[in-house]
Structures are given as structure tokens and as C-alpha cells.
Amino acid sequence: MTTTPIFSGKIDYKEIKTWDQTEFDEKNLVNDKDKVPIENFHINGPIQFKIDTEINSRICLWMGDICNLNTDTIVYSNSKTLTESDTISDKIFKYGGSEMMNDIQKNGECRYGESIITSGGNLPSRFVVHTVCPTYNPKYLSAAENALNSCYRSAFHLSMDVKSKSISFSTLHSEKRQFPSVGGCHIALRTIRRFLEKPFSKSFEKVILAINTFEDLRLYEQMLPIYFPRNQQELKFSQISLPKDVGDENGEAIVESRKIRIIETPSTIIREPEDYNCFYSNNNNNNNNVNNVNNNNSNNNNSNNNNSSSNNIDIIQKNNKNEFNNYKYDSIDKILNPFSSNFSSSPYDATMDNDSFMLKREDPDIEKRRQFSKKSEKQIENEKLKAQFQTLLTRSKVEDLSDVSRLNFTLQTTDDQNRPIVVIIGSQLNSRKDLYDQVLLYLIRVLEQTIQRGNFSIIYFHSNMSSQQSPDLSWLKKLLEIFELKYNNYLKDFNIVHPTFLLKTTLFISKSILGDKGVLSKIIYHENMNKISKLISKCNIPKSIFSYEFSKNEIDNFSFSFDNDVTL
């Protein structure tokens, strides 16, 4: 039987300075978004997070090991099975003891955004809240953000259930989950602020943010004035720095398309004629008509019995006709929505909001499908291609392409009019066909720099390229589509030197697929280097290209017949 070790090194949370006691540091007011000087900024519009000295007296920022704090509850992040090993969790389970493990086994697995509470064992804190931070995925951004928001809220509510008066949070958004530090910090602070604004949060005397790295400490020092301003200067800084979406009353991100949509009653409804009587509202008129018919019948009893029946029938038909014409029908809106102020005259009903909860908004899914259906197949393909190009462009800016750069397959020079020329050596890629994906990114990076100088030309050397080492048709198709999308308007001509029969065939097939326009219409084949020799004289062309030129065109000397009148 193992015994739980005794914890030493307890820190009294009451000795930690609260946010309102922390010295104001103007250096923390760093605004990188709009570069607006704080003193020149004027507050316009509603203030999202006002100066609240009572809340500021309950929030604390502290750097250290959360396990040392003697708050009633400590909160940390773990995996769904609560078996993740790191500095904090290892220490918690070391001193938590068998009682904590029993509580975990009773609760079982914990899902993303949820929390469970257990005994603190021999830790200074009485309780430990185990929560599960979601794995960050930009594709499911709102789900990840709201799950992290739920981690903080569920921890607060579980602590309230056990009558905690103090609580400390570690940094729940962890690097293991790829959660951005800045985004996670925004969610944490706005969720805590929204909770402390609620009346039932008064039971918490202290809420401590226990930070364990200097990077996070610096980040929280810059973010706290945004959500917990202490003076007018920080309030102005908050107005500048707040993101557009500050969430709802709980700090949870608002997803417009997920709001409840209930259709409002239609203004008209088609009914069968025999069903109209169910909408009659002129009850007094109905009674009068019936009385008139009865009176007429009683008078007619004194008349000739032979004429009695016919007269009664005429009177009833006449009254029914007048009755039908005089009836006023209630609209279906009033019948199904009788409390709407549009149809009511009572003072109480007049105060009802016209935009009631039954107001319908267009289903965003239907709206998107409607817009999508209006687009042609070509428009849809262009949008997909633009999205793919934006992804490639972003990757070309951030990825490490040093391996491709060392191949030296691109050179740059200028023509006699000082227009840029991009020279591509295909044989330099012969042995690295596995890098074609990075080659595409590198070409995008080079061309993005080139178009800053205006129109340009390309000279591509296909010398010494074997059929096995040539790029496949799908890669070439993607390259041509990107050129057509972004660089066609800048491209003056596309010169291919030493083309093979296979390359010409491949490009011919590409013309049949993509059409003989754009980049493909600007291709110029050169069987030798006579017409481009003047242009490439400034480049350090590999000797293998000259060797190929000599052997293919049976040249036995190093002189070329230059055509000085030819320019690209």
C-alpha cells in the first residue's frame, strides 16, 4: 500500500496583489492594430468593458506553480482520459492520492469543453477541477473557441457547487493542442470578465491567473487592461484593442447562422370557401341577421300559408347575401398571433415588440445554395482555383524552401528594355522530382517578387530532360492554371528552349484541356539558342546546356549567330 506524499511549499493566495493593487505600467499599452496614440483617441460608441473597481479587486495575475496555491479550487487542463503527463498534471496526481483517483474513476471520461471536480488530496487546495481544452483547428474555429469558453464557465460553476470562495486557473489553452496564445488569452479573459459581472459571482473573493512562463506573463499583462481597465487611459486602450467579436453575455462567440429561426405567420392564407365561416369576427352582425330572419318568419305566420314558405326563403337568401358581403374577416396573422401590436388596440398589447421571436430570417444554408446555383460551372471552378492559389501563396511566404533554393534552378536577368526575365533550368530538378510541390511554392515566391517590377518574360530550358524525370500532366496543369489566374496579364512571352517531342505533345494536350489562350498562346519554341543568346549572356547558364546545344545542333565551335534585331 502506497502512501500519498505530504505537500510542502504552500503559498497563501491572500498575499497575492490584486489587479487594482498592481502598479500601472504604460509600456503594457501596446497597440499594434491601428497605431492610434492613446492620448489622441476619443471613445465613441458603447463601452464593452467598463472600469469596475470591485471586479478589479478580485482578479489577480501571478506567476508560479499553481499547485502551490491554497485557493479552494485550482483548475488545469488535461486530456479526455485525464492521463496526459506534464509538469502540472504529474504534480497534481502525485499529491492527489487515492481519493482523487477514485473520484476520477467515478466520473469516467471527460469531453472537450467539460470539467469534473475531485478532492485535492494532500495539495494545498481543497478541490481540483480537471478540464479538457479542445484541439485547435482553423476549419472548426468557432467550435474550438466555444469549447475553451465552456472550460472556464464549467470550472466556475463546479466550484460554486462546492462553496469555493477562491479559484485559480492555469493557462488552459496549451501548445499541445495548437491553440494560439493570443486567441486563447482573449477567450480566457473575456469569459472570466463576463462571469465576474454576474451577481452570483460575488461568492468568489479571488480569481487568480497562475502563469508559468514569461511569454504568457507578458501577454496577460498586455491583455488584462483590455478586459479589466483600471483608468481612463486603459479604457481608451481597451476600445482600440478589442476584437470585433467580444461574444455574448457569457463571452461565448456568436455564430449568426446558428441562431434559432422560427417562421413568422404568413400574412395571407388560402382557404376553401366553406371554411370562411371559421374566420368570421362580426358576431353582433351575425346575431342581428338571425334575429331579423326570426322576426320575419313570425310576421309571415299571420300571412297566407301558401306564400309563407316562399317569402321566408327569399328573405333568408337576401339576408345571407347581405351577411356574406358585410362580414369582416380577421387576417390569419391576427388569428394565429393575437398578441401582435400590429392588430391590437389595447395599451398592453401596443407595448409588444413587432419584431417578436417569431420573426424569420432567411436560412443561411438555403441562401448559400441559392447563390451557388446561380453560378456557372466555370465561376465555381474559378473560385476553387482562387482559394487554392491563396493557400499556396500563404504557404510560399511562411514555409522553409531552402532545399529548393539550393538547386539553383531559377535565374533572373533583364532584356535591352530593362524588363525582367525569369530563367528556369529544368535539368536542375532532374534528381529531385519529389520536391515538385515545393518547386511550385518557390516559383510563386519568385514570380510575386518579379511582378512588382512590371511585365516579364520566361525562358525555360528543357535541355537534358528525360521523359521519366519530367513533371506529370497534373502538376503541369496546376502550374498553367495558376499562371492563367495570376500572372498571365504580366507575362509577355514564354520561351521554351530545346523542347522535346514529349513536351510538345504534353502542351498540345494541355491546350485541348485549357484552351489555346492565355499562357499557352504565348509559348515560343526555340530549337537552338540563336535568338536568345544575347539575353542569356548575362546569366550563369550551366555548361550542360551548352553541351546539349552543341551535340543536338552539331555545333563544333563556341560562336553563335546572334540576331541583334530580336528582343523579347
Swiss-Prot record:
Region (Disordered) residue spans: 281-313
Domain CRAL-TRIO: 397-553
Signal peptide: none
Xref: CDD domains: Macro_GDAP2-like, SEC14
Macro domain ranges (all copies): 46-228
One Pfam family named in its UniProt record: Macro
Family affiliation: Belongs to the GDAP2 family.
Alphabetical list of PANTHER family matching this protein: GANGLIOSIDE INDUCED DIFFERENTIATION ASSOCIATED PROTEIN 2-RELATED (PTHR11106), GANGLIOSIDE-INDUCED DIFFERENTIATION-ASSOCIATED PROTEIN 2 (PTHR11106:SF72)
Protein name, UniProt field: Protein GDAP2 homolog
Lineage: Eukaryota, Amoebozoa, Evosea, Eumycetozoa, Dictyostelia
